Amino acid sequence: METINLTQARRLALARAGLLKPEWTGMPRRATGVTRRARQAAHRVIQGFGYLQLDTVAVAGARSHAIVLLSRLEGFDPALAEALLQPGEPLFEYWGHEACWLPIKLFPVFAFRRKAFQQHPWWGDLIGQHPRMAENLTHRIREEGPLRSLDLEGRGSRGWWDLKIAKRMATALWSAGVLAIRERANFQRVYDLTERVIPACWRENALAKGDALEHLLLLGLQGHGWATTGTLVQTWRLRNEGEAIRAALARLVDKGAIVACALVDDDGRRLPGWVRPQDLELVDRLQRVRPRKDRGHRFGIGIARG
């Protein structure tokens, strides 16, 4: 079994995150203005991670996707972060780690999740319990065009409960693949029919679940550098898939795509994990990089509260 120490693992993680020698991992360094070239640089960052989470960091008063891109792309214009909320090809929004931008090539990969989410993980068989609402909502979008969450207000006869169910239904239909997110307007999702958002070439080539798991595990490992099985599972929220995950990892080992690699801590304890062979070569290159103060993970972060 290969081994890696803490310093090596930290440097590899930073490199794969685009924060150390980004040119060695194909990450861009700059994105100036709201130009096509800047947009392509942002897309390359997302491609490198496999996803970019969409969320609000309340204490920072900023969107998480903007913070991630600002920290990696010199000259990044925050206005581009908002412009990217109208992703279109080559990105789409779906459940990756959480609600994320994902490269469009991953749409076939998540077919297994769209199938599983016919029964929503939070609300159960909402579509089956309210078939008329599901049909009416889909029909309305088909006839009237894209629909925001705000557009659902005022249509029900029973006040907030109808609105609550309608908003959940839109999320459930999106999770099941009936609807897709066309864009975000003021950070609110704008729903449309999937066939009007996702090109047919991506909708018609669903991956089998086993192949999809291999793809996601390998992509997750690419983003982390070194990772435990648990970390890879959490990256894509692959809950209750233990046997399938173990089988997928075994196939990746047989293909030579990954190797078992133990992280050895300062006390000599070993934590089993995985690494891609090409990243072991990257570890050797990173050994020669002169460390900078606080470049590793041993630093503190303070938040001033006024």
Describe these PLM feature segments.
Residues 1-305:
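Long, low-complexity intrinsically disordered regions
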